[in-house]
Amino acid sequence: MKRILSFIPVHVLILFKRLGIVVLLLYVTRLIFLLFNLESFQNLTFIDFLISLWFDMITIGLFFLPYYFIYLLPIPIRGYKFHRIFFKILFHTTSILLLSLNLMDVEYFKYTSKRSTFDLFSILSAGNDFQQLISTFITDFWYLIFFLILLIVISEYLFRKTQIKFQTFTTIQKNFYKQNIIAFLLVVPGLFIIGRGGLALKPTGIIEASLYSKSENMAFI
């Protein structure tokens, strides 16, 4: 395993670790959703859990596209402070958005029997009503805010574990550009394909998930 990892550029390994953090935390929110809505999902199977994990990876492949595209650009600026700050902010902003949506579904599902993503645009277009909904949500479902804060703290702790010193323009090594260009050309398309759910002409959606799971379990996926 160490020999295989030695061929993978360090910045690519770090990217995978960071995306792995998001996979882990998203799945935690999925389990929280299940815990609070257990009566609606009595017939879940192991396949349902695997499919839900795959859809989390698809979500990350899509929402983190700006992150991994810019991060993998073959430019020796990863060692500079502004680069570290920018990507930390971008990482947490994107992950907090996804975690918040999943946690909001914990209670939203109880009232509508569907996930909030189906009604997200109509909710956002509500204007002042949306602000009122947010205020009510924070007041009535404060424990979800607690979960979110806890997950953010865990995310930051794990993110710091991935930080190391990188090459700069003054410390660049001979094979930097060759190694980084190859990594960019391989990893970015690979993650984008995951974000589409595969190589099919049409991106994978919830309809495709219904082929592998029962209709009553679709909201879990």
Please identify what each model-predicted range represents.
Residues 2-220:
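Transmembrane and membrane-interface helices of multi-pass
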